[in-house]
Amino acid sequence: MPTPLTLADFDYHLPPELIAQSPAAERGGSRLLHLDAASRLHDRRFPDLAGLLRPHDLLVFNDTRVIKARLTGQKATGGKVEVLVERITAPDRALVHVRASKSPGPGMRLRLAEAFEAEVLGREGELFDLRFPAPVLDLLDAHGATPLPPYITHAADATDERRYQTVYAREPGAVAAPTAGLHFDQPMLEQLAAQGVQRAFVTLHVGAGTFQPVRVQNLAEHIMHAEWYTVPEATVAAIARARAHGGRIVAVGTTSVRALESAAAQAQDGPLAAAQGDTRLFITPGYRYRIVDALLTNFHLPQSTLLMLVSALAGVAPIRRAYAHAVAERYRFFSYGDAMFIETPAP
């Protein structure tokens, strides 16, 4: 019997200077590390992806839109406070992370962005339930800031507002971008369509939990964060058409993987059907993928659930080798970094 995997199996050394602090000059300007079905590595450029896709392959994109979820302000006592909206639960209410010297209690009012007050209604675990004086999205659009990942050290600016968003983003609700999609520009999408590559969409609102480290050595003890997703009927039909024509289901990003495989789990042993709801699906090596045949993704943090997800698709050893190669070849890592195209290992 093989030895159970632990957190240490997903660790690797990453020189800090390889963490990309800004996007490539152009959306399609990144490098692409290709891990093929024979577990061979190829150094490519992102536009080369077009030559790796075939007619009838189906690209599944996550169309979530990053909201300006970060607000700063002060408590009634005058103490500084920082708010990060995690999930909008009603037009005027949201569950939020609060950073302050002392946690606010129910009934406390927070003065935010020097523009409005929000009331603390209560607490749900690590999150606070806030009531806003107007629709949350409107207030965030007017006063919020783009919530960059914790490993990006500069404050969000106008470039980030534009580039930390996919060109096809439609459904507002994410506090982190589905970063594999950041590489696509409109000409690339049109080129792929012209060569017969199909496209479909899911929605998964990426939460701040995507950056949370795994803190237990025994992976079975990890409690996965919840994210809201939907897989529409049109996407289910597109998957069936692609399968009928011999095409592959290519997930653009780990968030698309979570949505598709969550819908498959909800269907149990039945055919894939439209689905939506919260998912806590935790994909680790040994998981049997039901929908996804290939994956376009960025490079992920050491010891992260996303590194475990890609290892479940390609194998622990091939991913470990790919990451060592990427470090040696000075690829750029994480949200603004380079991409990786992973094909399912041949049986």
UniProtKB/Swiss-Prot annotation:
<dbReference type="GO" id="GO:0005737">
    <property type="term" value="C:cytoplasm"/>
</dbReference>
<dbReference type="InterPro" id="IPR036100">
    <property type="entry name" value="QueA_sf"/>
</dbReference>
<dbReference type="GO" id="GO:0008616">
    <property type="term" value="P:queuosine biosynthetic process"/>
</dbReference>
<dbReference type="GO" id="GO:0002099">
    <property type="term" value="P:tRNA wobble guanine modification"/>
</dbReference>
<comment type="similarity">
    <text>Belongs to the QueA family.</text>
</comment>
<comment type="subunit">
    <text>Monomer.</text>
</comment>
<keyword id="KW-0949">S-adenosyl-L-methionine</keyword>
<dbReference type="InterPro" id="IPR003699">
    <property type="entry name" value="QueA"/>
</dbReference>
<keyword id="KW-0963">Cytoplasm</keyword>
<keyword id="KW-0671">Queuosine biosynthesis</keyword>
<keyword id="KW-0808">Transferase</keyword>
<dbReference type="InterPro" id="IPR042119">
    <property type="entry name" value="QueA_dom2"/>
</dbReference>
<dbReference type="Pfam" id="PF02547">
    <property type="entry name" value="Queuosine_synth"/>
</dbReference>
<protein>
    <recommendedName>
        <fullName>S-adenosylmethionine:tRNA ribosyltransferase-isomerase</fullName>
        <ecNumber>2.4.99.17</ecNumber>
    </recommendedName>
</protein>
<comment type="function">
    <text>Transfers and isomerizes the ribose moiety from AdoMet to the 7-aminomethyl group of 7-deazaguanine (preQ1-tRNA) to give epoxyqueuosine (oQ-tRNA).</text>
</comment>
<dbReference type="InterPro" id="IPR042118">
    <property type="entry name" value="QueA_dom1"/>
</dbReference>
<dbReference type="GO" id="GO:0051075">
    <property type="term" value="F:S-adenosylmethionine:tRNA ribosyltransferase-isomerase activity"/>
</dbReference>
<comment type="pathway">
    <text>tRNA modification; tRNA-queuosine biosynthesis.</text>
</comment>
